[in-house]
């Protein structure tokens, strides 16, 4: 394994961190907030107003995100904030009514106050998540998704979040959009299309996109896996951080639905780590040694499988006290656990990923053509990897997944590793 890593045939992401904690997640903030929770040996009551909810959620996110090394996502933040806006509405209406104001003035003042709370809250998050480092010493990769809430306050949440990002932060005349939280717009053509009830929310997203690189747009009603889960079950799969999407875990049946009424669960689940294949190097090795490519590929797939099995076993021995908000206060599905309980029961719904990179270079090395010109071999390889990973899932009972590794930095390393072993090949290295 170490030699495979050194040579570059596989790459273990976050090698040191993966032995301490999990990777990325869809954190269930709603479950943590409901009824109150404990954080840092202090009891927090559930917020009674919107502005307090913003403060408390910000604290939860920074605390929990510091206990992991991958992307931290708060899914459907518009629906998360909606009940706290309703509480503020009720409280403010009673307050202004007691002052003897007429009903129209009360409504106007209350809605203005709630809008201001949303603006200040989202602005506060932007400052907090980009200037307050976590206890790990870095700035966590925080993502928030929104866009499907239909109530007036859910819509107000999404629109205000997008407007705050569009306007940017900083000195007058020098404002620029911040990095975190990364925003993802959940697009449903039946809600956001022309003349539909959330068209104004869609327009706010377009205005934001016209000025910034945000939000990312995730189609819930297009084609593919994400859309299929939404169309069949009405369940949204938000990305964990940047672009990692969870495989389904069914509430009754686990990896497979138990019956027609079984539904998948995504919120509150996480990933335990990624190990990526270096496919062009594996093909080059097979050719140099006059061996069957798939035989060599299977060797490295088995290597990754063993690493994942050990990761599940190692993490399973850890205690819930290593991340109390996640394991003990409801942030992760399957809890809450006691502080001294092992986290093994929660790992059954967690994914471990086989990363894939450089398919274009693989195809170029195979026959000198790009994916656009041919691509058949690359597709066959991906189908083979998919079959093997599904086989491993059934045999091991672990929820393995395939991950298209972004490889922003890894790609440079992989080129150097390829050159060192196999030299410079046009359109490959």
Identify the function of each model-found stretch:
Residues 1-348, 365, 369-429:
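Conserved catalytic cores of very large enzyme subunits
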């Amino acid at each position: 394994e170490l030699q495979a890593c050194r040579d570059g045939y596989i790459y273990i992401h976050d090698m040191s961190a993966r032995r301490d904690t999990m990777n990325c997640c869809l954190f269930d903030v709603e479950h943590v907030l409901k009824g109150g929770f404990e954080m840092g040996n202090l009891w927090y009551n559930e917020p009674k107003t919107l502005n307090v909810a913003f403060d408390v959620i910000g604290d939860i996110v920074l605390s929990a995100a510091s206990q992991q090394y991958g992307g931290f996502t708060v899914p459907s933040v518009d629906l998360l904030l909606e009940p706290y806006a309703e509480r503020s509405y009720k409280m403010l209406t009673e307050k202004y009514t007691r002052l003897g104001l007429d009903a129209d003035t009360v409504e106007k003042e209350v809605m203005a106050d709630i809008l201001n709370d949303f603006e200040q809250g989202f602005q506060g998050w932007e400052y907090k998540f980009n200037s307050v480092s976590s206890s790990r010493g870095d700035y966590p990769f925080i993502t928030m998704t929104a866009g499907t809430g239909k109530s007036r306050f859910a819509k107000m949440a999404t629109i205000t979040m997008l407007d705050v990002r569009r306007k940017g932060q900083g000195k007058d005349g020098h404002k620029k959009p911040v990095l975190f939280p990364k925003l993802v717009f959940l697009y449903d053509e039946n809600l956001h299309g022309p003349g539909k009830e959330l068209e104004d929310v869609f327009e706010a997203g377009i205005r934001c996109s016209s000025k910034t690189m945000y939000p990312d747009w995730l189609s819930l009603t297009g084609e593919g896996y994400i859309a299929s889960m939404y169309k069949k079950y009405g369940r949204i799969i938000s990305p964990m951080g940047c672009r990692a999407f969870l495989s389904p875990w069914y509430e009754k049946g686990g990896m497979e639905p138990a019956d027609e009424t079984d539904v998948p669960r995504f919120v509150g689940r996480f990933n335990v780590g990624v190990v990526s294949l270096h496919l062009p190097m594996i093909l080059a090795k097979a050719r140099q040694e006059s061996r069957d490519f798939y035989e060599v590929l299977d060797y490295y797939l088995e290597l990754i499988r063993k690493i994942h099995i050990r990761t599940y076993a190692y993490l399973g021995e850890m205690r819930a006290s290593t991340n109390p908000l996640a394991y003990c206060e409801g942030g992760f599905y399957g809890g809450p656990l006691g502080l001294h309980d092992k986290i093994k029961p929660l790992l059954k719904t967690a994914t471990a990923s086989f990363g894939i990179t450089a398919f274009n270079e693989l195809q170029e090395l195979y026959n000198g053509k790009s994916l656009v010109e041919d691509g058949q071999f690359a597709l066959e390889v991906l189908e083979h990897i998919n079959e093997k990973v599904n086989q491993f899932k059934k045999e091991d009972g672990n929820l393995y997944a395939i991950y298209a590794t972004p490889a922003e930095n890894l790609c440079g390393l992989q080129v150097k590793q390829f050159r060192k072993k196999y030299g410079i090949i046009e359109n490959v290295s």
